[in-house]
Amino acid sequence: MAVSAPAATVTIARCPMCGSDRFRTAFAEPPYSVHRCERCGLGWVSPRLGEEGLAGIYQDDSYWRSGSPKTLGYSDYRSDQRLYLDTFRRRLDFVLRRGPPGGRALDVGCAAGFCMAVLRERGFEAYGVEISETIGSHARDHFGFDTVHFGPLSTVTHPDGFFDLITMWDVVEHVVDPRELLRKARRLLAPGGLLVLETQDIDSPFARALGPRWHHYKHAEHILHFTPATVRTLLREAGLEPRQLTHRYGGKYVSTAFIAERAARLHPALSAALRPLTQLGSARVYLNFMDEMIVLARAE
């Protein structure tokens, strides 16, 4: 790695996962380029912010109420509470058919506490970890959780084997060192405990069809792009055995306004055609482009 100007920007000249210097540039949207490793298939963004710069993005409330959610952040994360709660209910119904019936659960990157709230509904003692107090305070102030740790997972002080279930929704694509993140999660899991990891699939048919217009190419924040093979390798290197990988439950409930906003990335005319949907008020739709994967892995 070489640091280029400005000083907070890092140029990534080797695969962050396998270390190979053999890669191709999938496409460029200056100042960013998306590279693909020719050895393992991982995708990554270069240049990217350093760790402090990345952390700073999520501390600013403009990330959680973004004027340009197509490229960074969310239009209004807190106001979509009902959509997130129902999304997590649907996902956890799938997970808990295969996971522990209760116990202690940790949501990594818990944001406003929506998944924690559903875990509590399902009978778990819910904990969270969140680097942004800006959004994490919602879990405390709105849901009454006093079990949110503010900081990276590496600073959590719970004893090894403390948790029966750990969830990571839309986390690994944001972090500089996902290998260390997962190793820490492995230490925190009880023997036989379950890790649930969800991230985008750069090799999904939808991602391939859209190319640079794929809505998960948000270069300032999504700095890594995984495939099923790279996720499985990463988990095994951390001491976790992947048991199931599915795209079926990676969808989410969204507002009609969200659909119109995302359509703008595909074509302005499509966005204009769908704009009347925004007049439907609180109407919602369950969307699944089969481009997000959920992996269940055991601590063995």
Regions found by a protein language model. Give the residues of each.
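Short N-terminal helix/helix-N-cap motif within the alpha/beta-hydrolase-1
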Residues: 176-180, 207
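Membrane-proximal basic amphipathic "stem/tether" segments
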Residues: 211-214, 251-300
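Feature marks short, surface-exposed loop/turn motifs that line or immediately flank catalytic pockets
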Residues: 203-205, 249-252
